[in-house]
């Protein structure tokens, strides 16, 4: 049996070139030529994360990448790249035109141009053959006129005349005509608004031969031209620059700390919803907080700057000196902080022992006691004088200007009236006086009223003892309505007693009620 041999197919580039037109290429051929195999996809995916350029990883030809293979240890060679560029023909530089030298002018010469007498020869016109009337033809002489222009030497004024040069044959006359000055141009620049494009209008003025007119030039500062060429730009610096610097605020304490960490730690430990906030004004919180918790003797020289624990017997329950510190079993050391108003706050964290289990564990709420210290006002600044002798200062003291004169007669006290000034300020003293009753008759009887024993009267004696009582007057403001400012409470019942009368006044309740009898008919 004859074995069948497998024929090798054509190369991949040839197969792709033939099947590309028909569009029926094999997947492996198409993916290999278009670099879309699995290896190419992995290379693109990994190349977006790490750099794999220049390694030649792919399904292409094994040429070692774009640079080829180099033997190990051999230096890499640098291949020349790029094309040589020849310089072009240099461009002519822009600049001023060539300056034509001008003849020097002698300052000693006169500025007046002398006039010369020119002789004009007679020109004879030869008419040729003489013919009759109507047959004679006049032929004028041909005159050649040539002008030469020299921009420097040919300078003519307002009164210049043409120069006539005649030859020897007196047949040809040459006129040397001077060039006419160009007409004067007036340049006027006008703009319309800040953003409008300026327009240049040139006005030509007509001048006569040998005359000149003034040149009027109007310059507008808003019109800007184009600068041709390189100009050096020099940066300008201010003569007296302002120095900028930052001022750092000095620390308020000798050992500054991080404000953020301190605020977070304080808020986490003292200011949370599980801690009761109690402000107190008990000064014992600053030095010895045990005085506000329990009764007892303590050493005043002992400074308790540590956490204190108080143990109590439940059978001997005693009230705390301060009600806010009741049932406190533990109180911490003092902590100093600063409030929003800038005051110093002394804080202590305590714990109450309100509940005790059978095992002996005490449970209670955490309490934050804080005391805000008052601010210390700054003392008034006192201007101190310089010690020793010094010059440059002079003080003028006028006692009449600085002192104030008060005349009590011209300016009386408005609080005292004339009637009050007549009153005797001395108090009367009747401690050693005797009551003497005299009468011109014998057997005269005097009736001295007595106070009933049932009346509760309070008698005020002005001269009690030998001391001096000073009474300060009080002013009471009465409004316009006539009512006093203090609340008025009437005294009920009111008991009236007149000690100077000789009769009694019965109360209406003491009278017997009379019954009205009606007669029946």
From Swiss-Prot:
Principal cellular location given in the protein's record: virion
Keyword set includes Endoplasmic reticulum: no
Disulphide bonds in the chain: 19-25
InterPro entries per the UniProt record, alphabetical: Late_L2
PTM field: Highly phosphorylated.
Keywords attached to this entry: Capsid protein, Cytoplasmic inwards viral transport, Disulfide bond, DNA-binding, Host endosome, Host Golgi apparatus, Host nucleus, Host-virus interaction, Late protein, Microtubular inwards viral transport, Phosphoprotein, Viral penetration into host nucleus, Virion, Virus entry into host cell
Biological processes annotated in GO: microtubule-dependent intracellular transport of viral material towards nucleus; symbiont entry into host cell; viral penetration into host nucleus
GO cellular component: host cell; host cell endosome; host cell Golgi apparatus; host cell nucleus; viral capsid
Cellular localization per UniProt: Virion; Host nucleus; Host early endosome; Host Golgi apparatus
GO molecular function: DNA binding; structural molecule activity
Intervals of motif Nuclear localization signal: 1-10, 512-518
Family, similarity comment: Belongs to the papillomaviridae L2 protein family.
Complex formation: Interacts with major capsid protein L1. Interacts with E2; this interaction inhibits E2 transcriptional activity but not the DNA replication function E2. Interacts with host GADD45GIP1. Interacts with host HSPA8; this interaction is required for L2 nuclear translocation. Interacts with host importins KPNB2 and KPNB3. Forms a complex with importin alpha2-beta1 heterodimers via interaction with the importin alpha2 adapter. Interacts with host DYNLT1; this interaction is essential for virus intracellular transport during entry.
Protein name: Minor capsid protein L2
Provenance organism: Human papillomavirus 4
Gene name of this polypeptide: L2
